[in-house]
């Protein structure tokens, strides 16, 4: 079998050097860059697969300015044979939809499509640090018409030419069997990427790299670049902190430091979360006519993800912004929720009681477990049939791959990981019109230091909402709605991916959203595998406190904890009354997931750790000294002022 292994990589700015231009787009001209971390794991996965297929052709591809050749040469030095760069000024400002289209067009130009006679596999990183959408791998796969697996930790090839992938899902993992060709996006928890030898690095310096422009690959300008992308960045605002300065404990011993913490906790300290700066430039709205671009599109559609026989919490959360948007749109705008699976009708009542006006049921025994190919096809058919103006997904493992594939099918842009959704207007100065109503999708970006407002001009407008950001609507017992059925046209090729195993246990993971206290460990608390972190949470539970433990991304990346416990921009957003950060440096991506906590206590050995700038109380010390002292205090009745659940 003449297999071709293709790796897609991106060169990204160092987080410390991220800069933004006046147009709200990333300014890469002066930033030092590296290969995106997740992409490195994709490169390594390709090299690992080559062990089974030693004659495989190894290709690495990228899209970007000429400076991206540096990243491609690194890939060549690691063991890849050919390198291709799509570089054209007309691609500048492309959103993920346009990027996925451009990359897939380059791959088709190179001879790769679902009808290719020889098998191929595409590897990519889960997401990039400068965008964090996780959309492009899915969009490339959809444009090529091939199956995919996202959030994959490890892969192996079986003896029948299939790929077996282990991927992370909420609360556990899943094993999928995919035929080739297929696309795989890797998490940074797989086989660590190798370092090239000096000989290979020198050899790569002189290797040739093929550079394409859009004319070379037959790509027009209609759907690329800033003008052709279906979404734009309309506004970017700074996110500023309103938490008061941290109150540090003083003392020489762990006992004195904990005594100081207890004393400080007893004092009245006002706490406020981060918020977007309120200073706004006063500008007059021009006297342009209003234009409603929706045509016949009307209504809001959401997808209800089903896990363990229940509607996922994140899908219920979606109904909160959906109701707000429906109220803002007025004109009797309805919320329809699609429910796909086997024997799922009884779940419709839960959706009615939480705000859905209509539940559209799609029944099929083959859909008992979520599969991206049939689910994306079903929802795309439903969108064509119902013509909604807005479609919302939760930004779960499934939602992050489902939404972008549907976006390609409908020609819509997709805004990822939104923390705010509302209806507004857009002043189009070029055409001298005011577009209204239009969905304003707000998402943190540039390391969570900015809040970008994204607008989509192709209907439906599609957005994913960060799990844990919105409250679940208040349940209205007995509320009724319209129960409908939808019968899609199935394609047998949509069922070519097999689920070999699904392991999903909620346990304490669901309790992260309901906990009053979360004890979270970072790299600085991994000396014992987070044992002390878990012991502190357990001690609080034994006293009747609703407590759970969690971790930062680096702990998951190092394989110490499962992804389902990760807090932060690429994990969960939580709102406990008290968040205890132990050995967590304070990367802004982690702070994004805890900024709405009532109080934050930080414990770190480094007095200059940035986590203290985002905390209410702090202790400088070794976690191995401080946490055992806290555990003893809890066992003796100290519960951080929390209410104790009645037995």
Residue ranges and their predicted role:
Residues 1-647:
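N-terminal glycine-rich FAD/FM-binding segment characteristic of electron-transfer flavoproteins
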């Amino acid at each position: 079998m003449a297999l071709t292994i293709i790796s897609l990589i991106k060169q990204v700015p160092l987080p410390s050097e991220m800069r933004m231009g006046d147009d709200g787009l990333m300014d890469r001209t002066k930033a030092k860059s590296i290969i995106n971390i997740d992409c490195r794991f994709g490169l390594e996965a390709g090299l690992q697969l080559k062990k089974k297929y030693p004659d495989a052709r190894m290709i690495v591809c990228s899209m970007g300015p000429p400076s991206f050749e540096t990243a491609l040469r690194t890939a060549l030095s690691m063991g890849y044979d050919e390198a291709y760069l799509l570089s054209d000024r007309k691609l500048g400002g492309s959103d993920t939809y346009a990027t996925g289209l451009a990359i897939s067009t380059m791959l088709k130009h190179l001879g790769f499509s679902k009808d290719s006679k020889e098998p191929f596999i595409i590897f990519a990183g889960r997401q990039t640090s400068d965008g964090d959408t996780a959309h492009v791998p899915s969009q490339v796969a959809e444009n090529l018409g091939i199956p995919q697996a996202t959030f994959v930790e490890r892969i192996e090839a079986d003896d029948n030419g299939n790929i077996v992938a282990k991927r992370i899902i909420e609360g556990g993992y899943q094993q999928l069997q995919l035929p080739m060709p297929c696309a795989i996006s890797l998490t940074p928890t797989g086989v660590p990427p190798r370092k090239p030898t000096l000989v290979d690095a020198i050899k790569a310096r002189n290797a040739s790299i093929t550079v394409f422009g859009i004319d070379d690959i037959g790509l027009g300008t209609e759907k690329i670049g800033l003008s052709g992308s279906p979404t734009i960045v309309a506004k970017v605002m700074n996110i500023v902190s309103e938490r008061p300065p941290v109150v540090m404990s003083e003392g020489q011993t762990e006992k004195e430091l904990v005594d100081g913490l207890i004393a400080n906790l007893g004092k009245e300290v006002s706490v406020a979360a981060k918020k977007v700066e309120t200073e706004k430039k006063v500008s007059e709205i021009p006297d342009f006519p209003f234009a409603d671009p929706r045509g016949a599109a009307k209504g809001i559609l959401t997808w209800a993800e089903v896990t363990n026989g229940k509607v996922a919490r994140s899908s219920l959360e979606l109904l909160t912004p959906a109701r707000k948007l429906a109220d803002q749109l007025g004109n009797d705008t309805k919320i329809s929720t699609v429910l796909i699976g086997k024997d799922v009708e009884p779940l419709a009542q839960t959706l009615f009681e939480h705000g859905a006006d209509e539940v559209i049921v799609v029944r099929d025994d083959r859909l008992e477990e979520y599969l991206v190919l049939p689910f994306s096809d079903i929802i795309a058919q439903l969108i064509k049939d119902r013509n909604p103006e807005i479609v919302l997904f939760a930004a779960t493992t499934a939602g992050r791959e489902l939404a972008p594939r549907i976006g390609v099918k409908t020609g819509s842009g997709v805004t990822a990981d939104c923390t705010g959704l509302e209806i507004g207007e857009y002043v189009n100065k070029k055409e001298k019109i005011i577009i209204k109503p239009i969905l304003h999708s707000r998402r943190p970006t540039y390391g969570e230091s900015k809040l970008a407002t994204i607008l989509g001009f192709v209907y439906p407008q599609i957005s994913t909402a960060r799990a844990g950001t919105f409250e679940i609507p208040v349940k209205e017992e007995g509320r009724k709605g319209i129960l409908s059925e939808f019968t899609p046209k199935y394609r047998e090729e949509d069922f070519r991916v097999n689920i070999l195993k699904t392991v999903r246990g909620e346990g304490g993971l669901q309790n992260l959203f309901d906990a009053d206290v979360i004890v979270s460990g970072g790299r600085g608390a991994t000396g014992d595998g987070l044992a002390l972190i878990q012991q502190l949470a357990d001690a609080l539970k034994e006293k009747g406190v609703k407590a759970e433990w969690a971790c930062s991304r680096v702990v998951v990346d190092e394989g110490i904890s499962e992804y389902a416990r990760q807090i932060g921009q690429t994990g969960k957003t939580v709102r406990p009354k008290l968040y205890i950060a132990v050995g967590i440096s304070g990367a802004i991506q982690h702070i994004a997931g805890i900024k709405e906590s009532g109080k934050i206590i930080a414990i770190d050995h480094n007095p200059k750790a940035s986590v203290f700038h985002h905390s209410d109380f702090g202790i400088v010390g070794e976690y191995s000294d401080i946490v055992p002292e806290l555990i003893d205090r809890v066992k003796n009745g100290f519960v951080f002022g929390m209410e104790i659940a009645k037995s």
